[in-house]
Amino acid sequence: MKLVGITIGLKSEDESLWVNGIKLNAAMLYLLINKIDGYKAILVDTSGKVKDYSKIKMWDTSTFITKDFYKVANDLDVLIQLSTSFSDQDINLFKQDGFNAKIVKYNCGNNYVIEMERIIFDDPEKSPPMTWSQSCDQVWYIPQQHKHNHDYYSIVHNTDALVVPFVWDPYFIDLRKKQLEETGNNTVDYSHTSSTIDAKRIMSFEPNNNVIKFSMPLIMIVEHALRIGASFKDYKVCSGQRMFKNKAFLEAISSLEIYKHGKIKYLGRYPIVDILTTDVDFVISHQWDNPLNYLYLDVMYLGYPLIHNAHMIKDAGYYYDDFNFKEGAHILKEALQKHDSNLLEYAEKNKTVLERYTNKNFGMVETYKKLLDNLFEPGKHELSYKYNWKTNDYE
């Protein structure tokens, strides 16, 4: 049995799982690897800030085994650097102390865009370091990053950069849903939302922290939908505080119909399950070259209508192409009018799509086993590394 450590960096025992997606990425990968024969995964915290891991609130540590990296490093056969990464200097020091694991850099975000924006816009004195370690045996990255990052990763890390299947699991959505329902909240599913078209509430969940995940395209879509006769109650922009404090932004949108009629509002950032219980009927999304995201899968898993431009799930939800805002507006209008008469078909279609990202996709699980095996015996398994979005696996 080979031991695989997946890095996380905890800020405190009280840290929420829902602050950002990176801890979820680690947990999803943990669940998958523990389904693979011959491998056992643990989560390894590199922060040094937690004294008692049994007290962390992020997850149940009897299910998600979490250890101090520095206490278990020499026991690892594979180190997957996911939430946190080490410099070459760090790795050399670990090796002097007996560390001998295979090292995989696992990238879950669009690092090219994130790092370039950091160089251009951040305060150079406060900007966090960019770890371009060349101590990795391989770089793995999820499919939606391929366009911007394949060559970038290979060059900066001076090793093979391999696209790997996207991993998702409804574990935490189910857990949070159960917690809310046990405390007396409404059942978290679309059947408990507003019934009449003119009462439908639209929401977007883009974090508005870079150009990839930004709400301006959605404002354009909702505005045009209103102009062509779509009926709805309002459109709420989650994580919109910074935008709506920007004078230039407010002056710009003041000419829009959704602003004049008081239909656009903003909220803070919330766990998606919590806000879906109270304030949402339709979810609309636009992300730039990011055609897979937990947001899409979570929303559809809970049965909510999703209007999106994610071409790797164009066979689910309500899809519009790329930056075609007017097309998105027509798709939104049609969904508002017809979705409630199409619930069963919508759910069945989405269920088939969702399963290709979970450990029910046995081909994907087997591919991850082959990837791990090949770290120890290069070439043991022949893999094409040509990703097919329709199967979430290699061709």
Language-model-derived ranges and their functions:
Residues 10-12, 27-137, 141, 145-150, ...:
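Extended catalytic core of nucleotide-activated donor transferases of GT-like folds
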Residues 116-188, 361-362:
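A short, active-site helix/loop in glycosyltransferases that binds the activated sugar's phosphate group
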Residues 67-69, 243-302:
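Donor nucleotide-activated moiety binding/catalytic core segment of transferases
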